[in-house]
Amino acid sequence: MVPSSKAVVFARQMAKQIRVTTPSMSATRFLSTGDNGQVDEQQNPPEPLPNRPLRGERSSNSHREPPARQAHNLGKSDTTLSDDGFLEQFKLGVNQDSRETPKPEQYPQEPLPPPEDSDEIFKKMKEGGLIPNAVAMLDGLCKDGLVQEAMKLFGLMRDKGTIPEVVIYTAVVEAFCKAHKIEDAKRIFRKMQNNGIAPNAFSYGVLVQGLYNCNMLDDAVAFCSEMLESGHSPNVPTFVELVDALCRVKGVEQAQSAIDTLNQKGFAVNVKAVKEFMDKRAPFPSLAWEAIFKKKPTEKPF
């Protein structure tokens, strides 16, 4: 069967149409494979999802690591953080095993008080037992004939520098006097003066008492006169006991002569204080009373 001319023409037109439409269909198929999602989104936009990343941004889950690796990295970051914290604590000195003892706050030092008078120092040291103890040590050394050892102790006390030198010298003088080493006592006394240390009333009184207790009465009167010339006066016990020793050894007239010598040096007898002292020491030898008041004890106005 031979096709008609109309059929041939129709077939040619269909073939031509097929040749034209085939590339466009293939192109459409090509586009659909590469950008199909874009065409779909433009035509039918999807429903919004929570935390959906914007277009062009990398999703946080695009390179998700395995759970084991995530746990390892998490532990590593925590360790790094804790190490940094530890270093900061170490710098600040916190949580250390061996803590340093905190230093006490330093306050500005107050100025030292002015030095006390030597007489006041003597009084406090006698009350505290320091001078008696020093004298006892020196006295024991001197009585045992250990004068060199006593002088070494004396030098050691001086080198310490914590006690005024007049106190140390006087303690040595008193120790020698109690050991009846009067020449050594006088030598130390003169050494004190030669070194520029002025004896005080206590120093003179110690030496005068040591002298009249050893019956060295002329020296006792001489040092008592020197004491007055230096601006010091013997106290009542020293004066009365010196007069009593003079009366016992040399008689009343010699005692009265010594009193007159002291009066010429500026010594004034405190009658009331002397009477009170002698009454407390009663019965006191009448010769001393007579030498001081120039009258017999029976004539005393009580």
Curated annotation (Swiss-Prot):
Q: Where are the PPR repeats?
A: 130-164, 165-199, 200-234, 235-269
Give the residues annotated as coiled coil. none
Q: Name one Pfam family in it.
A: PPR_2
* Ranges for region Disordered: 26-82, 94-116
Q: Which UniProt keywords apply?
A: Repeat
Which cysteines pair up through disulfides? They are: none
Where does this protein have compositionally biased stretches of type Polar residues? 26-40
Q: Where is the composition biased (Basic and acidic residues)?
A: 54-67
Q: Which NCBIfam families match?
A: PPR (TIGR00756)
Q: To which protein family does this belong?
A: Belongs to the PPR family. P subfamily.
The protein, known as: Pentatricopeptide repeat-containing protein At4g38150
Q: Which organism is it from?
A: Arabidopsis thaliana
